[in-house]
Amino acid sequence: MSLEAFHHSEPLTLGVELELQLVNTHNYDLAPYAEDMLRLMARQPLPGSVVPEMTNSMIEVSTGICHSGSEVLGQLTQIRDALVRSADKLNIAVVGGGTHPFQQWHERRIYDKPRFQELSQLYGYLSKQFTIFGQHVHIGCPDADAALLMLHRMSRYIPHFIALSASSPYVQGQDTAFDSARLNSVFAFPLSGRAPMVLTWKDFEAYFDKMTRTGVVKSMKDFYWDIRPKPEFGTIEIRVFDTPLTIERAAALSAFVQSLGAWFLAEQPFTPSEDDYLVYTYNRFQACRFGMQAVYVDPATGEHMPLRDHILQTIDHIARHATVTGASGALHLLRSEAAAGQNDARWLRDRQRDEQLLGEVSRQAALRFRGAPA
């Protein structure tokens, strides 16, 4: 199969996908209500789409094409409110977060869809362990070559995205000591990691052709890269975010991506190289493990510094581009929380420290998602 042509899109437009938990309201464990939720959601006129995911206790929602983080928030608000109405009818709840804190993977059931069944056959128990929940952000690119350039520039900021969105400290009832344990499940897949260092679409097509000839991949969907091109949309897709506990944070993260993209396009601040990836895996691990307390190694200089400091410096540096994109408020939110060392993983741990019961933590997280005070 040849690679699809890179379609035109308006530069810096956004699209956001959120994978969400469906839980019962008895003990707040995962509940197999995806089919019922999809049926109820289909009756409501909404932007974007609502689709099944790998197992039947999760769904994915997505916005349409948006021009700003505030437009993302507006669409997510409509979708969230419809989700809450539908869930209330079923006596269940919808929750954010990158992992469910105490679900048991072996109890999950693969959603009855051919691709999911094929993946289950291929990956075995990994498929059920893939009951994890991420946010994906698409950003429009001027052309195919510009998309690859933006992809590799964004790769320097993967640790920032991970730490700001981290919301998966608990797995099967245990504190993992990671802020983002979700990504450990992604890393188990053979085609995860980072995209190859090619900066022209012609070279990327050649790479894709080689991979398809091996029989290892059939389409771009087979790559579980941290960032991958989406030629059918004319975007790149950033895939390392945990699903936040609130749609406000999800929208703010998309605004951060857009502001970075605006900086890249306006100033062409650096040319990516293979050497950027010498510290890529280390930086990614640090962000997953320690979140806002991580160490960041600057790929250009080799300087070691607190990741939190680099996040603050980055937000300050792109502030004028955030003004142009209307993202100043969103970046102020992220900056203030980063300065305080706050992310959703810390919120979850604070709730567990206070409550000593993960079911109660999940209940309070459900309240946060629906916009009510926890």
UniProtKB/Swiss-Prot annotation:
Coiled coil: none annotated. GO terms for biological process: modified amino acid biosynthetic process. SUPFAM superfamilies: Glutamine synthetase/guanido kinase (SSF55931). GO terms for molecular function: ATP binding; glutamate-cysteine ligase activity. This is Putative glutamate--cysteine ligase 2. It is an enzyme of class 6 (ligase). Keywords: ATP-binding, Ligase, Nucleotide-binding. Belongs to the glutamate--cysteine ligase type 2 family. YbdK subfamily. The keyword Transport does not apply. It catalyses: L-cysteine + L-glutamate + ATP = gamma-L-glutamyl-L-cysteine + ADP + phosphate + H(+). Its EC number is 6.3.2.2. ATP-dependent carboxylate-amine ligase which exhibits weak glutamate--cysteine ligase activity.
